[in-house]
């Protein structure tokens, strides 16, 4: 059976790649030096966002109130399936040690990390499914501290459904 491409993107010449890398490197360096204040400055400049960077418990509750119940039900349905599968996956992985030759040991041991950072695409196109998949999987893995980060919609902040999902 041969593969037939139904759609295929035309190759285009790379443009601006070096400029982009330079700008990003400069921004990261500025944030490293300027910390949260510099990050806030970029959020205002690039996203027209001046709100909190870390959401408060009150903002989490307010975001949940903005999400329609049907959407919450759908998110919970997906979350339960993803977490259930991840828990089964974790159970299928076993710790072991084997002596391959006298004095030569090999093995594996699962140790959850203390903190996981979950990037959730947002802004123009919010991806709630990314929050479901990354947060549920991290929690199923036994991570104690799960942090979700998502870019704000210009002038509006993070999508309420993403905030709701990250808090499950």
Model-derived segments and spans:
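N-terminal Rossmann-like NAD(P)+-binding subdomain of aldehyde/semialdehyde dehydrogenases
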Residues: 1-114
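Conserved protein kinase catalytic domain
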Residues: 43, 163-166
């Amino acid at each position: 059976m041969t593969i037939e491409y139904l759609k295929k993107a035309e190759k285009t010449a790379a443009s601006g790649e070096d400029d982009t890398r330079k700008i990003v490197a400069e921004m990261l360096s500025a944030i490293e030096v300027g910390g949260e204040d510099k990050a806030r400055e970029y959020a205002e400049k690039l996203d027209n966002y001046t709100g909190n960077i870390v959401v408060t418990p009150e903002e989490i509750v307010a975001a949940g109130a903005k999400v329609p119940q049907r959407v919450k039900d759908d998110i919970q349905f997906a979350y339960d399936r993803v977490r259930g599968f991840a828990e089964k996956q974790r159970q299928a992985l076993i710790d072991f040690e084997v002596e391959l030759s006298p004095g030569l040991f090999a093995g594996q041991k699962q140790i959850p990390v203390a903190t996981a950072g979950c990037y959730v695409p947002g802004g123009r196109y919010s991806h709630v499914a990314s929050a479901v998949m990354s947060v549920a999987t991290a929690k199923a893995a036994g991570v104690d501290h799960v942090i979700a980060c998502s870019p704000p919609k210009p002038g509006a902040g993070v999508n309420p459904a993403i905030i709701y999902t990250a808090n499950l």
